[in-house]
């Protein structure tokens, strides 16, 4: 599996609008096992995104989907920046298939 955890920043006061765009574009994407959007209780303009994919290629391919491209274009004016993005290797958990770690 392939995972990403990222923190995005909306322009001041636009967090909810940006979350609406992200939530509208998170329908069934091939290879996507989990796509979670969360607010940051300590930061009114921050959004955390946690993704789990079957593999990195599925994530990369998702960025070319027309609905994802449309969401990126719609959100671009209200994205203030990306604070960081971390790649992970999920090994399982509630709702995910187990992966051998050895």
What does each of the following model-derived ranges do?
Residues 1-47, 52-66, 77-102:
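Short S/T/G/P-rich N-terminal loop/turn motif that feeds into the first structured element of a domain
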